[in-house]
């Protein structure tokens, strides 16, 4: 299963693609879509949508996992972040992909084992889990963490489904 993890942001939207093969997680790609703050906000949203649409077309993930961000420095930041999340979600839904949302605490719990882990701990664990030569850039690392969270959650959900 190919999973696209997304860490939405109005300036940088991180993406991370992993492949889950049995119990193995394999790194496929990661990076970030950068928008120019000098541009009008609708143009920035369009860049996020278009960039993620191109990534989806290239890697053909089976599922998308998005970080559900609920904290922001101020109301305006929260609104912009919500709109960036919307652009990311629409890019996935537009081509029929299922979208799953995870809180930062759920992501940290799945990757490190505690929902109160520090960012550096999460980054080091991602490096180890995916056998990366170095720690990924921050937004990409967060997106890889979201993808790993979904990989773990999907496995647990499948077990519970089979129990019923």
From Swiss-Prot:
Compartment(s) where it occurs, according to its Swiss-Prot or TrEMBL record: Cytoplasm
Cofactor: Mg(2+)
The UniProt record lists the keyword DNA repair: yes
Active site: 7, 67, 139
Gene Ontology biological process terms from the UniProt entry: DNA recombination; DNA repair
Reaction equations catalysed: Endonucleolytic cleavage at a junction such as a reciprocal single-stranded crossover between two homologous DNA duplexes (Holliday junction)
Protein residues bound to Mg(2+) 1: 7, 139
Pfam families per the UniProt record, alphabetical: RuvC (PF02075)
EC number of the protein: 3.1.21.10
Binding site for Mg(2+) 2: 67
Keywords associated with the record: Cytoplasm, DNA damage, DNA recombination, DNA repair, DNA-binding, Endonuclease, Hydrolase, Magnesium, Metal-binding, Nuclease
InterPro entries linked to this entry: RNaseH-like_sf, RNaseH_sf, X-over_junc_endoDNase_Mg_BS, X-over_junc_endoDNase_RuvC
Top-level class of the enzyme under EC nomenclature: hydrolase
Bound cofactor: record note: Binds 2 Mg(2+) ion per subunit.
An annotated Gene Ontology molecular function: magnesium ion binding
Disulfide bonds: none
GO CC annotation: cytoplasm; Holliday junction resolvase complex
Subunit note: Homodimer which binds Holliday junction (HJ) DNA. The HJ becomes 2-fold symmetrical on binding to RuvC with unstacked arms; it has a different conformation from HJ DNA in complex with RuvA. In the full resolvosome a probable DNA-RuvA(4)-RuvB(12)-RuvC(2) complex forms which resolves the HJ.
Function: The RuvA-RuvB-RuvC complex processes Holliday junction (HJ) DNA during genetic recombination and DNA repair. Endonuclease that resolves HJ intermediates. Cleaves cruciform DNA by making single-stranded nicks across the HJ at symmetrical positions within the homologous arms, yielding a 5'-phosphate and a 3'-hydroxyl group; requires a central core of homology in the junction. The consensus cleavage sequence is 5'-(A/T)TT(C/G)-3'. Cleavage occurs on the 3'-side of the TT dinucleotide at the point of strand exchange.
NCBIfam families xrefs: PRK00039.2-1 (NF000711), ruvC (TIGR00228)
Record-stated family: Belongs to the RuvC family.
Entry protein name: Crossover junction endodeoxyribonuclease RuvC
Organism in which the protein naturally occurs: Citrifermentans bemidjiense (strain ATCC BAA-1014 / DSM 16622 / JCM 12645 / Bem) (Geobacter bemidjiensis)
């Amino acid at each position: 299963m190919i999973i696209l993890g997304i860490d939405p942001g109005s300036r940088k939207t991180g993406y991370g693609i992993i492949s889950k093969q049995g119990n193995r997680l394999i790194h496929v790609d990661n990076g970030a879509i950068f928008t120019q703050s000098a541009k009008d906000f609708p143009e920035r949203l369009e860049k996020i949508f278009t960039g993620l649409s191109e990534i989806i077309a290239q890697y053909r993930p089976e599922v998308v996992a998005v970080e559900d961000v609920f904290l922001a420095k101020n109301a305006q930041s929260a609104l912009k972040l919500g709109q960036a999340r919307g652009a990311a979600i629409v890019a996935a839904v537009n081509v029929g992909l299922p979208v799953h949302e995870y809180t930062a605490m759920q992501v940290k719990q799945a990757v490190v084992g505690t929902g109160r882990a520090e960012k550096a701990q999460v980054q080091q664990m991602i490096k180890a889990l995916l056998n990366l030569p170095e720690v990924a850039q921050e937004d990409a690392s967060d997106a890889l963490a979201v993808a790993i969270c979904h990989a773990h959650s999907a496995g647990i959900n499948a077990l519970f489904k089979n129990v019923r």
